[in-house]
Amino acid sequence: MKFKFKFGEFFLGLATLLAIVLSIVLWIFIMTSDQRFSNIGQNQNNTTKQQARSHSAKSLYDLYIPTTSYGFVDGRLCQLYDSKNNLTLEFTKEIQKAKAVSDVKKIVKSRAKYEEYLNDDAYLQLVYPDEITFSLFNHLNNSNNDNREFNRFFVSHSNNIIYLGNDQTSAIYRIKIKGANFDKLRKFARNAKAKSPVHLVKLQEGYSPFYSRTTNSKVYSYLTNHQSYSYFISRLLGTSGVTSKTNKSGQTIYSFNYYTRLKVPDPESGEHNYLYTHFEKNKIPNATNRLLDSVYYVHQLGLTEQDLRFFDADGSNVGYVNYIEGIPVFLNQHDLQVKTTFSYDSINVAFNSVNFQIPIPFDGQTQELKPTAEVVSELGAHGLKQSDIQRIIVGFKIEKDSSHHSLINLIPTYYVKAYDEWKSVDEWEKKNVAAYRKLRETVKTNEVK
């Protein structure tokens, strides 16, 4: 028996080694052929804030890509996904070519009419996770100062008209365009490999997809790495004139003059969270410039950006996460990859240095996900009412794999945004929701005073 155990151990180790080698080969193949990676090596390291605000940074379109696609299958609304024929990338490629030939015209302003569009099988829907402004893509708008917001594209059978919807205000706008051809997008939608039945439910921040049945979602694995803290010091502060000071918790703060600093994690902690701060007295930028300026700071970090996407914008905050197989990845249970915060006296950029480097071939492991309505009902029993929920989505939670120090597993789970905080369902069920509610009521009372 002892001999057999060692023999089995040998083959297990050999299989793991072969899987890693195969992953490296696949990674090289993907890097040289997959459209997602076609722009690697063209990082916008030299992008200035002025270039970002003038919309001249090419990867503006790489970061601001719709992240979810919907279409109808046999009269039923489905979330569509195909890793090979990526609908959102195909849409973005065509919308970049589009040019507005008319002014933006509001055609819908009631919730009832808005929901008619949501449930109309004549449209494909390409959706951002949060609102962006009309002026972000100025070729679709004849005004550079239009801070009206939208989060949803409706693509009809025509290539000459595009509709933009705002889930929160129930407004739909029509723009006549030229230069785009969505025929391939429609073909991708018809033939999408993943078609998950959903219905859209209005929550605080818009319509979230509620999955109608229990699903077994794939667990993915990746080899990860992290840039050294010296890499970020060099990029963000420079190589000369930098001073440092270590606090009691082991964190070191590096400073360049009085205006710029970088807080790095304790090397022994295993943490990879950084905080970059630039002090400057200024007005908080308007909505469009917050989105554009955050692109500038993302580029300054020097993170790998091929799967990094705009994810959340609340007031003065703009956040980005990595999307893998169409699903957002949360770090440290519920953190975003990058979060920029604008204030009157500083700009803060909190970020994590993780890089999802090499995908491991799928081994068949899955995670069961309940129907969304059932999850919301369970949260209600723990005190988090549906009326408290701003958004609910399926996201990836990271778990370390014991077989290799750099190997992680991405576990599908429900994430909920409530009281302006993202947490997994498991986390919310352990929280004192009454305390959150009381704090919110206190803040509202003070605002009235």
Q: What would you call each of these model-derived segments?
A:
Residues 1-8:
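N-terminal Lys/Arg-rich, disordered targeting/topogenic segments
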Residues 9-30:
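Hydrophobic membrane-insertion alpha-helices, especially the h-region
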Residues 361-365, 395-448:
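Extended hydrophobic
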Residues 140-163, 378-413:
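Amphipathic, soluble alpha/beta structural segments
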Residues 231-275, 304-347, 352-354, 393-422:
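Exposed beta-strand-loop-beta-strand "reactive/processing" segments of non-cytosolic proteins
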Residues 4, 25-286:
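Preferential activation on post-signal-peptide N-terminal prodomains/segments
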Residues 279-316, 362-403:
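Short, non-transmembrane alpha-helical segments in secretory-pathway proteins
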